[in-house]
A protein has these predicted regions:
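Active-site entrance/lid segments in N-terminal catalytic domains of soluble metabolic enzymes
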Residues: 1-185
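Glycine-rich adenosine-cofactor-binding loop
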Residues: 187-192
């Protein structure tokens, strides 16, 4: 959690994290005044919506989000931006007018499809870019034990057993899925 260095973290982790979003963003902006700055926020985090909205208030250019399906990220970003512009008045079309880029982390065709369809249906928007994390990335990717075995990523010697060509087929499917929504929204959606 971003606020773990704050002496008050153990008493009030939420407040420590919200304050740290601003202080870390300020430090990063001093280092890179013209750079693109963002936050990687886990969708499985207990206060996910609050953290996303606070990152927008801090001035984030992009929110990258995985560790679960960030299906409501567009809502949190658009509402935070609308409140910055208009106070508590949420006008129609706020999801199409956002400035903060949205970048979900996906590991499968299915996760890319769920996110893109949900964002399209609920918020009339699509990702600005998509990050792929494969079975060797570790972390919170949601691969089943069977999938890890299929990709050869379930052993201590992954560098020898990993079946890159098998996962590359999944990557091609993710790119194809994202392209459908890029075409629909008439915009480029890089897949990283």
């Amino acid at each position: 959690q971003i606020g773990f260095r704050n002496p008050e973290f153990m008493k009030n982790p939420l407040e420590a994290n919200l304050k740290a979003i601003h202080s870390e963003f300020t430090k990063a902006r001093e280092i890179a005044p013209e750079g693109v700055l963002g936050f990687n926020i886990m969708a499985a985090t207990k206060e996910y919506g609050r953290y996303v909205m606070e990152a927008v208030r801090a001035g984030a250019d992009v929110i990258i989000s995985g560790a679960g399906l960030p299906v409501d990220m567009p809502k949190f970003v658009a509402e935070a931006e609308a409140k910055l512009r208009f106070g508590d008045v949420l006008e129609p079309g706020i999801y199409e007018k956002r400035r903060t880029m949205l970048a979900p982390i996906v590991s499968s065709i299915k996760s890319a499809m769920v996110i893109c369809r949900m964002w399209d249906r609920k918020y009339k928007t699509a990702p600005d870019f998509v990050v792929i994390e494969g079975p060797c990335a570790g972390g919170h990717l949601g691969f089943s034990r069977e999938q890890l075995t299929e990709y050869g990523a379930d052993t201590d010697s992954v560098s020898v057993t990993y079946k890159q060509s098998v996962y590359e087929e999944e990557i091609r499917g993710i790119i194809k899925t994202v392209k459908e929504f890029a075409d629909k929204y008439k915009k480029k959606i890089p897949v990283i």
